[in-house]
Amino acid sequence: MDIEKKIELVSRKPTEEVLTVDNLKDLLEMGMPLQHYIGFEISGYIHLGTGLMAGAKIADFQKAGIKTRVFLADWHSWINDKLGGDLEVIQKVALGYFKEGMKQSIKVMGGDPEKVEFVLASEILERGDYWRTIIDISKNVTLARMMRSITIMGRQMGEAIDFAKLIYPAMQVADIFYQGVNIAHAGMDQRKAHVIAREVAEKLKYHPLVWDGKKVKPIAVHHHLLLGLQEPPKWPIEGEEEFKEIKAQMKMSKSKPYSAVFIHDTPEEIKQKLRKAFCPAGEVNYNPVLDWAEHIIFREEPTEFTIHRPAKFGGDVTYTTFEELKRDFAEGKLHPLDLKNAVAEYLVELLKPVREYFEKHPEPLELMKSVQITR
């Protein structure tokens, strides 16, 4: 496969940003073996924003000949008070429910889960020289910068936090260098940590990325954060700047079940959630149902997406590009309920293998349910 095709695979939907395409091209031209990683906190049920968005990109990286790795961030989850802050519970869920759920998500998005390396963070964090890398990074970043970076944990700047949470950004940066990762992948909300990694890359003494005797910066690939299905906290949204301000509150959230579809939801749960979704007629800028259609259904174009309607409402209609769908919705030619029903049906079919897996292997999901009940 030529270099341009590899760059196209890395850059396509749901990717929103590559830091930088030129750097990626340089690494490919140098012939440097590429190692990807994406890290996850272990916090609750896997929703589509985690499973399908990450799974789609992992599939793309594999097609581009890049080694892929999922980093199960148990210590990071402990620091960030996930699953009651109980490290043993976090580790059980990580190696049971979460690992299996991600494998199935990768599979339905066209990737090969057997070619993904799964690493539990504590396997490397408990080595002494990992912490030397943390100190090396920390000596090259100001306290103010670390304070601003706590948003990667879903925390607000100025929020009262314990001291352990200040170590978190340096740990996330260290994870990249300590594992020899040259493609750091995450959602857009993790951008600050990756920018720090790129800024300190050429200053590090311990575990820098080196190729042909030269220190190199890791590439950062950030995928789109799916909008939650709920109505935004303010409506209407007046312009792009206001949207940026409230975007964090609009993303899918495990703590708001009706904002998210989980990978093992039943067909009826999926349909019910989509029926209740915020989807104003004619609104194409801040519309979660259209957002899901764009980044899940129309990830690859052309495709065929058929919306079934009674003849009196125009009959069935098939779209091959997102722009066609968006135009008809904007012009009122497509009713919100028809769009919701069609997206729901698509997801029901897409997620069928995941549901079937958990029906045949119920133990991981039962463990997760028991943890949720006792939290």
Swiss-Prot record:
L-tyrosine binds at residues 37, 168, 172, 175, 190. Signal peptide: none annotated. GO terms for biological process: tyrosyl-tRNA aminoacylation. Coiled coil: none annotated. ATP binds at residue 254. It comes from the Archaea. One of its GO terms (molecular function) is tyrosine-tRNA ligase activity. Its EC number is 6.1.1.1. One of its GO terms (cellular component) is cytoplasm. Catalyzes the attachment of tyrosine to tRNA(Tyr) in a two-step reaction: tyrosine is first activated by ATP to form Tyr-AMP and then transferred to the acceptor end of tRNA(Tyr). Homodimer. This is Tyrosine--tRNA ligase.
